[in-house]
Amino acid sequence: METSVSRVTVSLTLLVLIICSADAMNYLAFPRMGRARPGYLAFPRMGRSQMKTETGTDCCGLGMKSEFVIGQEGKEELRHGACSSSVACCAGLREIVDQKQDGVFFSMCVPDFVASRSSEESSSEVLSKLKSLLQK
């Protein structure tokens, strides 16, 4: 009887180990799939600069460039968006500076349209949409 109990114990232990290793394989074998699955702990990507754009060029792409905030104590803070404020916008984009309703100044790179009547209308539409997104 003692032999069969140890066989059952060994069998159950192996079964638990196989199940645990099958679940752990998803966590350990594919660390970059972490954002696709909820509750998954992914390893950080090493060796990538957060200041560069996706294309790897030295210019800012479409979107937020920087924010200038004056805190309650009068402390000034410059927050960088996708790139630093010293880098120019990429070709085909121009930089605009505006102010939110709460007093925060921001700069962003928006498409630079040719100065024709139809493009002026579409340029103002794009600018108003981007401003409405910033106010949310």
UniProtKB/Swiss-Prot annotation:
Signal peptide: 1-24
An example Gene Ontology biological process: neuropeptide signaling pathway
Alphabetical keyword list: Amidation, Disulfide bond, Neuropeptide, Secreted, Signal
Propeptide residue range(s): 49-135
Chief subcellular location: secreted
Top-level taxonomic group: Eukaryota
PTM comment, free text: Contains three disulfide bonds.
Tissue specificity comment: Highly expressed in the buccal ganglion.
One GO location term (cellular component): extracellular region
Localisation: Secreted
Residues that bear Methionine amide: M33, M46
Family label: Belongs to the SCP family.
Role, per record: Involved in the stimulation of contractile activity in the gut, the increase of the amplitude of the heart beat, and enhancement of the contractile response of the radula closer muscle.
Protein's UniProt name: Small cardioactive peptides
